[in-house]
Amino acid sequence: MQGQAEQKAEPAARTPAADELVSYDPSTGKELWSAKLGDAPKEVAAARTAWPEWAAHSNAYRIEALRRFANVVRKEEAGFAELIARETGKPLWEAKTEVASVVNKVDISIEAYAERTPQRRMEAALGNKVAVRHKPHGVLAVLGPYNFPAHLPNGHIVPALIAGNAVVFKPSEKTPATGEFLVQCYHEAGIPEGVVRLLVGGPDQGRSLASQSGIDGLLFTGSARAGMALHKQFAETPQKILALELGGNNPLVIWHAKDLDSAATIAVQSAYLSAGQRCTAARRLIVPEDDHEPLITAIRKLLDRMVVGQPFDDPQPFMGPLIDAAAADHVQEQWLNLMMKGGKPICRLERPDGQKPFLTPGLIDVTDVRDRPDEEIFGPVLQLIRVKDFDAAIAEANNTRFGLAASLIGGSPEMYDKFWANVRAGVINWNKPTNGAPSNAPFGGVGLSGNHRPSAFYAADYCAYPVTSSEADRARASIGEGLRDPNMQED
């Protein structure tokens, strides 16, 4: 399948037209893709027209269509992974895992729909029969992120389609080519073009889509700031569903781990996979004051060996560039801010080529920094915090407005029980990284990390609404109290 994305020779220097969106390869700076900006009212109208017929089909019909979609993605796996690698800069090996996740999401969503939104019939009081079934909302808008431009929006779109909704999907303006390719896969599988619409554009088109009266809800993955803006906007439309999957300032507590090499490996995986551009990436490493130096030495040795490079290099790098120069600039500014506040670099964050968004992994001790910013540093930066005891470690883990992921490495079962009971997060792990959440479980956070609409296995919950019905074969009714006897005469 051939989309509009091509390898183009020209650099990113040309100025796009006012009505055009251009995507660039972050590892080279060259133009990758371009298209005209879309029209949100037009796309919503098309989805509204197509929705009733799609909703009228049986679940089995829609499930079969999604299974065909999975087969299309399998067939296009190599080209899809290459496109993701080019547009995001992530290594090809990682792009391949994303394509595999797109495929796996179908069977997981089918299972989730059956488990979370089944038809149920029950007996109520006095022999009454009760049925619980679910209906689709209608037309759902999906706003996708750039870090997993296929997997994360697909995690909204597939369960929405199974439930009988139509979708208008606006990919991130930084990864539109991947979004277009994903939509083409739905269409090639025989899902009507009106049922899955692609809206090309940037923030203006996203705001326009969110404001359309013709949508029945919006499913968003992105920053807390954008999520809060959507939350305020949708406060005036409580009849519309809003699911927010936001970021995190995630703690990784390593407490007297017996296997230092494994603990260091988990720390590196948690903090630096995808160049730190994961909402579940570890941002804060919390360790005991009296027993941390051997661990830090082990982490430094891994960081010294870490390869940062182009997505198609052979051998493959551990991580590629950030999504663009602006993102790299922002992470560098956040790093410098920590240093200005008294942070002590252990492994310095560096930018080998100032014109490109490649960053080396940074590790900085911020124990003595006052007023540490409670923000998501969306890049390869890990902040070390030394504490006196395990209670202080838990308090530090909770020292954030976010609440997405947290992990404890080491400790005892009793300590993990205490950690689990007292840490406020939607994902809490033991001896596992903060990232890599399983798709057959709910995924979401509390605080500024979401609005209590977890995705993954629980996405079925926000893609359909329950309808309770009391039912009988024929009407039988009587009024037992409060009526005069018809045979009695009034005085």
Regions found by a protein language model. Give the residues of each.
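N-terminal Rossmann-like NAD(P)+-binding subdomain of aldehyde/semialdehyde dehydrogenases
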Residues: 1-129
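Conserved C-terminal structural/oligomerization subdomain of aldehyde/semialdehyde dehydrogenase
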Residues: 25-34, 215, 351, 358-491
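Residue-level signal for inorganic ion chemistry
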Residues: 29, 62, 84, 106, ...
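Short, well-ordered beta-strand elements within core beta-sheets of diverse protein domains
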Residues: 31-35, 49-56, 142, 252-255, ...
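Structural signal for hydrophobic packing residues in well-ordered secondary-structure cores
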Residues: 51, 55, 70-77, 81, ...
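Rossmann-like NAD(P) dinucleotide-binding subdomain of oxidoreductase/dehydrogenase enzymes
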Residues: 118-262, 316, 387
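A short hydrophobic/small-residue beta-strand
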Residues: 166-168, 345, 427
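ALDH superfamily catalytic-core signature
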Residues: 217, 225-368, 430, 478-479, ...
